């Protein structure tokens, strides 16, 4: 599973998820990508479940790129613990994903296989998603 090797602070503020992603909106490595349509935290377990779903469906072919990483820790207090007495212990790691961010990319397989693999992965994630195709750069242009 994905976890940071080391962090400066074990406990972080929750933060805000306002607006769309600043970068990572285009498919850069593969031919197809899975784009988030809403902002959310995605845990390292959800990322791993999506990766396993894609790679199992594709069998031995193709390549998967994971474009998000769980840098942020989240905390939780035990069940039945009263309010107060400090912040809880770190419970896991999440990736902060804003809308329009490409989370996964697939290359080296046919369009049907890529679309089905990304569809299976989308069911493992807590956000609405859409499958996007790579924009070909430097092709025919009908500008002046």
Swiss-Prot record:
Molecular function as annotated in GO: rRNA binding; structural constituent of ribosome; tRNA binding
Q: Which UniProt keywords apply?
A: Ribonucleoprotein, Ribosomal protein, RNA-binding, rRNA-binding, tRNA-binding
Superkingdom assignment: Bacteria
PROSITE patterns with a match to the protein in the record: RIBOSOMAL_L16_1, RIBOSOMAL_L16_2
Q: Name one GO cellular component term.
A: cytosolic large ribosomal subunit
For this protein, the record's InterPro entries field holds: Ribosomal_uL16, Ribosomal_uL16_bact-type, Ribosomal_uL16_CS, Ribosomal_uL16_dom, Ribosomal_uL16_sf
GO biological process, alphabetically ordered: translation
HAMAP family referenced in this protein's UniProt entry, alphabetically: Ribosomal_uL16
- What is its biological role? Binds 23S rRNA and is also seen to make contacts with the A and possibly P site tRNAs.
Task: Say which family it is in.
Answer: Belongs to the universal ribosomal protein uL16 family.
Describe, as the record does, how this protein assembles with itself and its partners.
Answer: Part of the 50S ribosomal subunit.
- What protein is this chain from? Large ribosomal subunit protein uL16
The organism of origin for this protein: Latilactobacillus sakei subsp. sakei (strain 23K)
* Name of the coding gene: rplP
């Amino acid at each position: 599973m994905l976890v940071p090797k080391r962090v400066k602070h074990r406990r972080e503020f929750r933060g805000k998820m306002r607006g769309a992603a600043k970068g990572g909106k285009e498919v850069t490595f593969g031919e197809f990508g899975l784009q988030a349509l809403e902002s959310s935290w995605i845990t390292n377990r959800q990322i791993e479940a999506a990766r396993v779903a894609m790679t199992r469906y594709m069998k031995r072919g193709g390549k998967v790129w994971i474009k998000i990483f769980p840098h942020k820790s989240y905390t939780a207090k035990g069940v039945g613990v009263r309010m107060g007495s400090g912040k809880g212990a770190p419970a896991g790691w999440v990736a902060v994903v804003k809308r329009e961010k490409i989370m996964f990319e697939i290359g080296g397989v046919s369009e049907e296989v890529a679309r089905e693999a990304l569809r299976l992965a989308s069911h493992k994630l807590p956000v609405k998603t859409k499958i996007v195709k790579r924009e070909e750069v430097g092709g025919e242009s009908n500008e002046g």
